[in-house]
Amino acid sequence: MKASELQGKDQAALTKELNDLLKAQFGLRMQIATQQLNNTSQLKKVRRDIARVKTVMNQKDAK
């Protein structure tokens, strides 16, 4: 997901996206804990997507 895609969304859509990503991150962490996740780079991607969403949300709040 690119930041330019996120900047076109409104605050409600960004909040929903953030909640979805946080749920995905929790699921991936549980899979790592139970040793079911083979591709651990997925967690890194989700973590960075969360950071992107939060950054765009903060930028919109500052305006």
UniProtKB/Swiss-Prot annotation:
A GO BP entry: translation
Coiled coil: none
Gene Ontology CC terms: cytosolic large ribosomal subunit
Stored InterPro entries: Ribosomal_protein_uL29 (IPR050063), Ribosomal_uL29 (IPR001854), Ribosomal_uL29_CS (IPR018254), Ribosomal_uL29_sf (IPR036049)
Gene3D superfamilies with a match to the protein in the record: 1.10.287.310
Pfam families attached to this UniProt entry: Ribosomal_L29
SUPFAM superfamilies to which the protein is assigned, alphabetical: Ribosomal protein L29 (L29p)
One GO MF term: structural constituent of ribosome
Keyword Ribosomal protein in record: yes
Keyword presence, DNA-binding: no
Keyword terms, alphabetized: Ribonucleoprotein, Ribosomal protein
NCBIfam families membership: L29
Family statement drawn from the similarity comment of this UniProt entry: Belongs to the universal ribosomal protein uL29 family.
PANTHER family: 60S RIBOSOMAL PROTEIN L35/50S RIBOSOMAL PROTEIN L29 (PTHR10916), LARGE RIBOSOMAL SUBUNIT PROTEIN UL29C (PTHR10916:SF0)
Record-given protein name: Large ribosomal subunit protein uL29
